[in-house]
Amino acid sequence: ANIGYYSLIFAKLVGKNGKVYAFEPDPENFRLLVKNIRENKYNNIVPIQKAVTDKSGKIKLYHSMEHRGIHRVYNPGGKRKIIEVDTTTLDQFTNNKIKPKVIKMDIEGSEYLAVSGMRKVIKKNNVIILSEFWPRAIRKCKTSPKRFIDELKSYGFKINYIDERRREIRPIDYSSLMKICRGGKAVNILLQK
């Protein structure tokens, strides 16, 4: 969730009867997220100070000293402070009681780990996923971009590229997606069944 920019947008979209669950493991970002929610008077955002991954427990977070939005679960080098943060899975968090309609992920290459921890959620709900796709970071998290896409397709998701320059969303295959990401580029994808 970082400091809540998208959480506030989604909270407005879901209205008073909807809920936004905003996960942010970094203590300082979490403090700013809570402050942002309070100052904007949103009662339908539930902040959770945990990272979403493939298991519940603890994980090392390599904390960026330059940019509060690029903390990672792998060591990317550079000046980093290591902190230990709590983790959860969406399967455990929802516990068959919360039925998400939309999941937004921009977790610096850890998206495959998060998907691995939400298999029940994906199977039981007709969920839409908005996700960052950054092959370089996915590899640093010890999986392959193809494995991530294949996992999503195995649940029946169609992959769509969000072309921000052209302001359009269009279906895309894996090889075309990888061509767009050449040179270390990260893009956003929309996944729908």
Write out the residue ranges for each language-model feature:
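Phosphate/nucleotide-binding beta-alpha loop and adjacent structural elements of enzyme active sites
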Residues: 1-193
